[in-house]
Curated annotation (Swiss-Prot):
Example GO molecular function: 16S rRNA (adenine(1518)-N(6)/adenine(1519)-N(6))-dimethyltransferase activity
One Pfam family of this chain: RrnaAD
Function: Specifically dimethylates two adjacent adenosines (A1518 and A1519) in the loop of a conserved hairpin near the 3'-end of 16S rRNA in the 30S particle. May play a critical role in biogenesis of 30S subunits.
Homology family: Belongs to the class I-like SAM-binding methyltransferase superfamily. rRNA adenine N(6)-methyltransferase family. RsmA subfamily.
Keywords assigned by UniProt, alphabetized: Cytoplasm, Methyltransferase, RNA-binding, rRNA processing, S-adenosyl-L-methionine, Transferase
Protein name: Ribosomal RNA small subunit methyltransferase A
Organism of origin: Escherichia coli O1:K1 / APEC
Reaction catalysis annotation: adenosine(1518)/adenosine(1519) in 16S rRNA + 4 S-adenosyl-L-methionine = N(6)-dimethyladenosine(1518)/N(6)-dimethyladenosine(1519) in 16S rRNA + 4 S-adenosyl-L-homocysteine + 4 H(+)
Length: 273
């Protein structure tokens, strides 16, 4: 028997499809999400409705974004969810979550078992809409969750950690073994909760500058910032901010990256493209 077939649907490798089928895990995730009637609930990648059904049972209305045409069609004819669903057969990477929040008249609560092959770029796409999002709950590769929650001075700490924590409070929820899926992925998974900050703990004047600094620093993470960011900051400027030029990218806190971004935004602002 082909272990990529689940409920009559062949999992597509190009979409990174692995279908959740462990009831205990499903119940735990739904409990963590705690959906309530009247909330603007949005699921990314509902697949075969493992989360859609138990979440939808608690709601009068649920919005789903599904790239796979066959799966979107299955949801349209779902025996009890169909009338509750608003289905966007679209790539979440190009979806405008701000427009949807405006249409629904409230911030979105976004959740999903995300395809692991696009999870990191999708996170960055969602970060650009955090003013339209109340919270997010995602199943991700465990290694990605580790990176999201990592602090300075750890191997997992990187650009994703800094940008996620700049935008959100990041909370790991539970770990999930490969056996909870069909077909089983080759990696462990985990569920994470991301809650956009109501008030930014480390406001920056231009988030594009923060993105640039973290990209340049972590692209050369083994170099000291005296070298990796030498084109942006002199040793004197770094020292003046209380940042040791001999530190590497992984030693610098989110607050310090934001401090550096604000200095650069004031003294060498990016030109509007």
């Amino acid at each position: 028997m082909n272990n990529r077939v689940h409920q009559g649907h062949l999992a597509r490798k190009r979409f990174g499809q692995n279908f959740l089928n462990d009831q205990f895990v499903i119940d735990s995730i739904v409990s963590a999400i705690n959906p309530q009637k009247g909330q603007a609930m949005v699921e990314i990648g509902p697949g075969l409705a493992a989360l859609t059904e138990p979440v939808g049972e608690r709601l009068d209305q649920l919005t789903v974004i599904e790239l796979d045409r066959d799966l979107a069609a299955r949801l349209q004819t779902h025996p009890f969810l169909g009338p509750k669903l608003t289905i966007y057969q679209q790539d979440a990477m190009t979806f405008n979550f701000g427009e949807l929040a405006a249409k629904m008249g409230q911030p979105l609560r976004v959740f999903g078992n995300l395809p692991y092959n696009i999870s990191t770029p999708l996170m960055f796409h969602l970060f650009s809409y955090t003013d339209a999002i109340a919270d997010m709950h995602f199943m991700l590769q465990k290694e990605v969750v580790n990176r999201l929650v990592a602090g300075p001075n750890s191997k997992a700490y990187g650009r994703l950690s800094v940008m996620a924590q700049y935008y959100c409070n990041v909370i790991p929820v539970l770990e999930v073994p490969p056996s909870a899926f069909t077909p089983p992925p080759k990696v462990d998974s985990a569920v994470v909760r991301l809650v956009p900050h109501a008030t930014m703990p480390h406001p920056v004047k231009d988030v594009r500058v923060l993105s640039r600094i973290t990209t340049e620093a972590f692209n050369q993470r083994r170099k000291t910032i005296r070298n990796s960011l030498g084109n942006l900051f002199s040793v004197e400027v770094l020292t003046g901010m209380g940042i040791d030029p001999a530190m590497r990218a992984e030693n610098i806190s989110v607050a310090q990256y934001c401090q550096m971004a604000n200095y650069l935004a004031e003294n060498a602002p990016l030109q509007e493209s």
